[in-house]
Amino acid sequence: MNVRLLFGLMLMLVLITAVACEDSKSASSTGSSGASSSSSFEVWAVDQSPTSAEHGGLLYIWDGDDISENASQATPEIIDLAVAASNANCPAPKKPHMVLANHTSNNPLDFRFSRASHVVLANVGSGDTFFINIDSRSIVGCVNTLGGFNGAGGTANTHAATASPDSSMVIVANIGAKGESGFLHKIQTDYTNDDYTFVETLPLDQFSNALGTSVARPICHDFTADSEFAYVTMAGGGLLVVDVGSDDGTTPMTVVKVYDTETVPGIGCGVARLPNDKIMTNGESGAKGGDDFLYTFDASGAEDGEFENPVKIELPGEDTHGAVACTDQDGNLFAITSMRVSNDVNFVDLQTNKVVATQSMATNFSLDPKPDVADILGKKMFIALRGHKPLTAIGSLESADRTPGVAVLTISDDCKSFNWEAKDLASMTDSGRTVPFGLTGGSVITAADPHGLEVVIK
C-alpha cells in the first residue's frame, strides 16, 4: 500500500515509542536535549486507588515545562474521576489503569508528535473505556464492553485501550476473568463529534493451543503505522498479530500470526512502534522474578503475510515494564527499559541488540521506587512510581519505602545513563486517603497507587 510505504520511509527519520503495559502505551523521542524543545505538552498520570468506596481514582495533569524543570514544585491539576464520570452520565470507573493519547492531526513525519485531541482511559476493574477531551478535561464518551458485542464475551478487566494512528478506531485489550481467556474489543471513533460506537468483539480462547498456553489473555497492543495491524502481547507469553479490519466492524478482526511462548517467552507487557516498520515489546518475569526479555519485530512484511521471528534480547534485573526509545547524538537508536521489581533501568543498543548499561533508580530519597509505565520526550523520561500497596500486578510486594508519583529522569546524550535528584520527583501522595498497612494493619499509609502515564502533545 502506497500510504504504508510512505509512512515507513518517513518513520526512519524519527522515533516513536510507547511504553507500556499493564502498561502499553505509545511514547516518543527525538534527539533534542530536553522536553521543552517540542511543542506545548503535558504529562498525564492516573492514581488507580478509589476515591469513592471501591470506585473512582485521580487523574493528575502537569504542565510539561513545569514538571521537567522542577517536578517536586510543579503543581498538577487533579481530577476526581468518579465526579467527572458522574458529570458525564458515565458509570463510576474502577481502577483507572492506562491513559493513551489519540492521533487526530497527523504529522506526516511523526504522528505521535501531532496534536492529540483526546486521551483514552482504560479502567481495569469496571470494563469501561473513557474518552477525555484534552482541552476541557471532561469525559466526553464512555463505552462499557462487559459481555462483549452481541454477547460475544467480555469482563470488567479492560486493561488497555489504544487509538489507531488514523483516528478511526480504538482496540481494547480485555484480559478476561482469572483462569479464563480474554477478548479484543473494537470501538469506532469520531473525535470531532464525540461519537464512540462499540462494534466488535474477538474472543481469543481459540488461539490458546497455538500460543502454547492454557488460556489466551491479552495485555497490551499497538498498531502498525498504517493502522492495518495490531501487535498484541499476552499474559502467558506469546504474541498475536491481528489484522484489525474495518472501523465499523463489517470487516472483522482476524489473527494472521501467532508467535508461541517458545518464541516469545515472558509475561507480555508494553508495545511500541519504532522507525522502519519495527515493533518493540517486552516479556517480563513479574512479581516473582525470573527471566526478562526485550523483543523487536519486523512488521514490514505483515501486509504480505511475512512474519519473521523477533530479535530477542535478555535483560538483567527483574520485571521489565516501561520501555521507551531514545536517539543519541549520532542518530543511533536505543531502548530504555525500567525493571519494576529490581528498580533498575537498562539501556539497550538497538544496532547491536546488546544491553550496554544498567543503572539503579533506588536512592536515598526513593528507596524502593518500583518504576512502571513510562514515556519520553526529548531526553526527559517520565515514569510512574507505584504505591505502597499496589492494586494490580505486584500486589504481593508491599513496602513502606515507596514514593508514589512521577519520576523525571534526564537521559544522557548518548542514551546510556540518566540523572535524577529529589527535585525530579512529583509526588502523588494523597494524605486524605489511607489504607491499613503492616502485618497487623494497625497503622495506615497513603492509598495512592500510580500506574498509567502519558506525555500528551497539545
Residues covered by each model-derived region:
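Bacterial N-terminal signal peptides that target proteins for export
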Residues: 1-8
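C-terminal motif of bacterial Sec signal peptides marking the signal peptidase cleavage site
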Residues: 17-20
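Predominantly soluble domains enriched in secretory-pathway, periplasmic, or organellar proteins
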Residues: 22-458
